[in-house]
Structure formats: structure tokens, C-alpha cells
């Protein structure tokens, strides 16, 4: 306060000195005025004195219409004034050809009236937070709104007639500025009426928030239209109004916020009426039954939010007009009620097992897959797995006296039913008889959660997948820059973490692809083949010996025939039974004999000369 008084006294003394010096030089009134207006230093001193007088006038009018200004009102006034001064300086650059003392005075008056519009808006908003409003407050606000409305209308009318008579000039800017101030006065007046009606009623007015929301929506739409028309006219008749960019952006943002609030509030109120249950008397007794919005006890008509906080229905309706969060925990009620609106997705188990497109061959149980080697994977974990239903249980192993028969597949090597398999050591094991019961069929490998292999799905080409990244050995292999790139909450840190997850996903896909290839190769191998000798004559002789059925074990091995001589046939040897011969001579389904059948025919040709 003391600094302000010193500055005003210094400005007054400097102005008196300049006027006295000019009068001392000219000795007459009119030449003194001409000298002051033509001298730049004298005009600068006079401008400073004019600003001081405007400041004093503002102080006086503030005391009359507002009394003591609150700290929040002063803060808002200073914050908006700095932006207004900056926009005024930009307007001076746009209208530099019209720069004159009258032009500066008009902009100063516009800034002066804007300050009172802002103070009136803050003071009317204070009515909602103040329980006691005196009659002096009503008289001040009503008289100020009446005065501001009259001044705005007069300046708009003056600018309109000036544009009609003199054409487009700087009055175009003042006309639109005062028109926007008129919409502000209209908004202040509607809010004042709504607050006054609410103060007169004993109970809180539930529909006040609705009217205020639609009032802001209506006046915001008018402001956006005015700014768009002003920008269009200024660009067409003068130049681009750079000083109007910020207020136009603020008006558009405020209008967008009003539209969003209207939509979200209606959605929140609809959810409150349809989704949120009414609070029971037991729930009200279990918690503090005081509504934190209105500070009154809740007896009936209370709603329970998804966060289990309870409020009055009318209080929640008024609260949701402004924000869609819980008044206590600030939980987003729209996001919390989103899963309740959408039905849950059906479980994959309800769909049942998918139908098998083609009969798939069964794999023999490999000995190198112990039980529980691989744990079952959760469904949908890897994109390469096809959807599958429940898997059949693994059949029990065959008894010690029975041998599992290999499945007759096209990929596995088939053997005759009555033939015995000869091992590398020379011992032979007899196969089951044709009339015997076959052993249990082999199922999927134990420990695998899928029936291998994918016979109906072709393998993708190896170049269809992205190159596999090299997995790091640990954090010790990362540089400090790479570690810092993974830490933090900024965008580059999130992108680094997402890239790491993509690398992990690629490695898992590559591992599943290799498992798929391994199982496909394993399915095509079939049962293990016996070890064969290098000499073809010995192989032929061993096959002949194994092909002859015997009821008792031989005491000694059959002699190996020399090359070129046919082997002797024992007297007790008999031709095979017709049933077994018929079974042996059966061909596969495709009509072509396999390797075992061809070998049997060659043996028959070798035996035919000896038999005769």
C-alpha cells in the first residue's frame, strides 16, 4: 500500500512539472496544449498519469460494488489481467496504422470493464459457497450487472453505427469484444437468479445444477459463434487477428467441456437410477449415516455406489451434474459401472470340444517323455495353438505278456501280423496270433496338453516370423543407458518396456513353432526298426528263420547257408496255416505292397526250388 501511494505521488509530481514547464515556455493555454501533444516525453508522462487515474477509479468502484476483495478474486484478476495486457499489445501491432491516443484510451476502457466482469463472475459464484447473503450484497451485484449491461450495449451500438458509416475499422474489434462481454453478463445474471432461488428455498434445489449446466452450454455456443464470425470477418477485411487466438481457444474448450459434462452427467444419472441399489436401513446403521454432500442424516432415499459409499439420491444427482466421481474416494463411477453394462464373454469351456476335421493317426507312447515332463499350458496363451477340447486320458500300459501292436499308418512301417521281430543280438520275440486280442492303442504323450501332431494344419514358412531377438543373460549384460530406458513413467520408457514384451512374445512363438515341428517329425517316425546286419545273406536267413512258426523254442540256431546254395529245410517244418497266409497276403489300403510284403515275396521265390 505504501509503495502504491509513493508511485501515485511521484506520477502526480512529474505530471505537474511537465505541465508547468510547457506553460512556462508558451505562456498561453492553447499553445501549451499543442506543445504537450507534440512532445513525446510529455505524452509519455501524461499516459502514466492517465493509467494512475484509471487505477484510482477502479479502486473506488471496487469499494463501492464489491467492498473488500477476497484473495482468490485478486489472484484471478491479476492472472487474467496479464493475458489481457498481452492480447492488447498484439492488437496494437495489428492496428498500428490506427494507433492514436483515442485508440489507446478505448483499449484501456475495454480492459477496465473486463476486470469488473471477471470480479462480478467470481462474486456470483461465491454465493453458492456462502450460507449468509446480505441485502447489501444483492444491491451491489444487481446494480453492477445493470451498469455493465448498459455500457456493453451502448458500446456495441456505437461500434455497429461506426462500421455502417465509416466502414470496417478498429471498431469491429471493440464491437465483438463488447458483444462477448454481453454474453458474460447474461451468464452472470442467470447464475445469480438460480442461486437466489436456491437460497430462498428451505431444501436444496435439485434442478439447479441442470439449469446451470445448460446455461453454460448455451452461452458457450454463442461465444463460439461470435469468435468464428469475428475471425472470418477479420481475415476477409483486414488480416489474421493473432490476439484473438487464445480467447477463441478457451471459448471452444469451455463449450466442449460443457457438452461433455452434459453427456456424461446424463449417463451417470441413468446408471444411478438403474444400476445402483438403494441403501437398506441395516447398511445405513452399519456406517455413518451422514451424507458428506449436504451434511444431513440419511434416513430414506439413499443410493449405494459401487465403492460402497452411500449418499442421498438428490445429492448424487446434483453432484453428477458437475463430475462423475465418488465424493469420498474419487472413483470414476462410469468406469466402475462399465463391466455391469456389458455382458460377460462366454467361457471357452461352454463351447464344447471342436469337431475333428480329419481322423488323425495315433502316436505310440515314446519312452523319452516321462510323465509330467511339461505342465499343461493355459488356453489361449500362444497364438499358434488351435482350439482344442478336453483330452482323453492316457490308456494304461499293456501287461507283461502282451506286446503293443503298432498302428497301421501310412507313415509308419507296417509289418506282417504273424512275423516276429529280430533284435540285433539275434533273439526273437513272437508277435501275437491273428486271433488274439490286440493291445491298447497308444494315445498322446503324457504330460502334453495337446493331441500331437497338427496333421491338418500346414507348417508356416520360417520366413513368415520376425527374427528372434537374442535373450539377455541378465541385468548384468545391460548397459546403464538400457536400464534407464526401461525405468521411468515417460513415453520412451513405456515404449522400451513394450518392446521387451514383444521380444518375449516372439521368443515364445518361436519355441512353440519348434515344438510343433518336433512333434510332426516324431509322428512320422513310427516304432523303432530292428538293427540289420551288413551282409544281405545273413539278413535273408534270419528273416526266413523268424518267418517259420514254431511251438517250442529251438535248441540251437539255424546254420547260415553259403552263398549260391539254398538253405536246407527241416522235416518238421510245415507251410503256414491258410488263415495266417491270408492275413499276410493282405495289401495296404492304397493297393501297393510295402517293404515287408516285397521281402516276403522274395523269400517265397527263394524257397520255391527247394520245396520242389
From Swiss-Prot:
Residue ranges, annotated region (Interaction with p53/TP53): 236-270
UniProt feature, compositional bias: Low complexity: 416-434, 539-559
Keyword Phosphoprotein assigned: yes
Chain residue ranges for the region called Interaction with SEL1L: 21-42
GO biological process: ERAD pathway; immature B cell differentiation; in utero embryonic development; intrinsic apoptotic signaling pathway in response to endoplasmic reticulum stress; negative regulation of endoplasmic reticulum stress-induced intrinsic apoptotic signaling pathway; protein catabolic process; protein stabilization; protein ubiquitination
Stretches with biased composition (Pro residues): 341-375, 393-409, 435-449, 560-570
Annotated localization: Endoplasmic reticulum membrane
Similarity comment text for this entry: Belongs to the HRD1 family.
Protein name per its UniProtKB record: E3 ubiquitin-protein ligase synoviolin
Gene: Syvn1
